[in-house]
Design a protein with these regions (language model features):
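Conserved N-terminal entry element of GNAT/NAT acetyltransferase domains
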Residues: 1-14
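Conserved beta-strand-loop-alpha-helix junction that forms the acyl-donor binding cleft
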Residues: 110, 134-145
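Conserved GNAT acetyl-CoA-binding A-motif
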Residues: 119, 126-139
Length: 149
């Protein structure tokens, strides 16, 4: 296993959609029923604003897309391009935490350090941009990662 990381580009977007769909469907299903998983798809997904802002990472495992996630200076805490109520307003880093956003690990790559690497990349990049605090909203499937961090 050789994990590599880089900033996501618009060319990555077509490959991210099936990764996110697999993560939502397979990783949440132990805790949620089918209707709840479908409802999760309505509020979760990739926010291309993060890619445009240069704050979204992809992680590959031996060349295979294994995970993704980012951070944001914007007010939106969660949601993909299709999610209603997103807010692109810029946060004040002196008084407001940046957001850790849209973190997904492909189910075939869980428990291999992918999520931890994405989180570390996000925290380091946010700190380099002058951010002193971050916040996130987690799913029940992601909670163990964030509690261990």
């Amino acid at each position: 296993m050789a994990l590599t990381s880089r900033l996501a580009t618009p060319a990555d977007l077509p490959a991210l959609t099936p990764l996110v769909d697999a993560a939502i469907g397979r990783l949440l299903s132990p805790w949620l029923d089918a209707a709840q998983v479908e409802a999760s798809r309505a509020i979760m997904g990739v926010d291309t604003r993060l890619v445009d802002d240069g704050t979204y990472f992809v992680v590959e495992d031996d060349g295979s897309l294994a995970g993704c996630g980012g951070w944001s200076r914007r007010a939106t805490l969660y949601g993909g391009d299709h999610t209603e109520g997103r807010d692109d307003a810029l946060l004040d880093p002196a008084t407001q935490p940046a957001r850790i956003r849209a973190m997904y690990t492909h189910p075939d790559h869980t428990r291999r350090g992918v999520g931890r690497l994405v989180l570390q990349l996000c925290e380091a990049a946010a700190a380099a941009a002058g951010v002193t605090r971050v916040q996130l909203m987690a799913t029940v499937a992601g909670r163990p990662l964030y509690e261990a961090a």
